[in-house]
Amino acid sequence: MKMTKTFLLSMLLACTGCTEEINTKEVYVKGDSGKFPDYGEVLAFPGAEGFGRYATGGRGGEIYRVTNLNDDGEGSFRDAVSKSDRIIVFDVAGIINLKSTLIFSKNLTIAGQTAPGDGIVLYGNRVSFTDADNLICRHLRIRMGIKGSDGKDAAGVADGENMIFDHLSVTWGRDENFSINSTTARNITIQNSIIGQGLQNHSCGGLMQTDLENGITLFRNLYIDNKTRNPKVKGLNQFVNNVVYNWGSGAAYNMSGDSEGSSLTSIENNYFIKGPVVNWQNVRQEDGSIKVELVDMSPTKPFIGGNERFNTYCVGNFYDEDKNGVLNGVEILPAINWEELCSGNPTFLATCPEIFPTISQQSDAEKAYEWIVKYVGASLPVRDQVDAYLISELTSLGEKGTIIQNEQDTQQFPLGGVGEIESGVSLLDTDGDGMPDEFEDGYGLDKNNPDDASQ
């Protein structure tokens, strides 16, 4: 396969997406320790936000073309992520059935939006981003499923820094869906992504737990059909413009300040929308046997947990609990209706701490909901059937939604798995430099010269 050194391509590929403006704010300050490490003044891509916005990915590295859907071997995605310093593009679309954990190396840019057809699905096992420093990962679907390892997350970070995850769709974890659970993980953003349908009997959105020195940003994501931990938060955390839909008896946003250690959080302009709250779970029968049945649940309040060590700037958040098909929530006002609508006793802050980076695309909660309906998840090249189904649940505004145990059981989940993924046809790239001919023609480049990728 052809590999070419390039800096330009990482910037060009980044221009694909649904971006409103670019954040050019100076590197933010971290307490008494001076500035966070400056990984470059250039954003990871236009629209990158939060603590991970300066991730460099595979900038300056080789272009690796994924040419097949095999689990391993030359041209496979597993081979692509096995070495550092790469920009990974796709000549194929479809389902990659993972036989074992997929481990990502450092200094990678994964441009899932370059796939033809309906894009890429990673199915059947977990992925690990642990120690994958300086990672840019965009437009991938990570769907673990019932045949994945019991008690494992669909995706996770146990260590590492300077990562940004954009337009991912992460579902069907058997422990958490997507967790960052580490005292050393830092400078990480998850944005514009779906984190949904964690499988029973441990259906969880994810742990977002660091310490006070290491920041995580969760911006404009959809947590949907997870019984609990949507997410569970500890440490330095920025939670802005997210939608949480159809959580169960565990928790929507869990303020885990009652755990050891303190937290500093910004919780701004999010929408919490109650769903039908039914779930498929194991039920013991009178004869002692176990049967999977659809059971009603009693949902918790949108915020639970938290004590005086959980410090939060909490403004502009709404709660819609009437399940009537209309978005008409009430604002959660800590000084007025907190005890009525929520539980826990965090310490409320009057102003947002300066340690949190400015979110240039931040909006009010209702506009965030509208944006999420249109664009969230791995929406390029197109939104797949699973994500479309989840969005149809969300837009029912309380009338649809199920917490499932097995994605392959059509009684629980009508698609019975990942659905159909069209392969499509990759765009012509005569010189193999990772830029399609029509792009090079449009920007005055030479489609017969691979060296212009580095200009």
Mark where each language-model region is.
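Proline-centered structural pivot motif
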Residues: 422-428, 438-455
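Extracellular beta-strand/beta-solenoid scaffold signature
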Residues: 123-128, 148-156, 172-182, 199-210, ...
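Acidic Gly/Asp/Thr-rich repetitive segments characteristic of extracellular carbohydrate-active
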Residues: 43-88
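Right-handed parallel beta-helix
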Residues: 107, 112, 133-144, 159-174, ...
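Extracellular beta-strand-rich solenoid/capping regions of secreted or surface-exposed proteins
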Residues: 78-84, 95-111, 120-138, 144-161, ...
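Extracellular beta-rich repeat passengers
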Residues: 233-414
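Bacterial Sec-dependent N-terminal signal peptides
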Residues: 15-35
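Acidic carboxylate motifs that coordinate Ca2+ or other divalent cations, activating on Asp/Glu
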Residues: 324, 429-433, 437
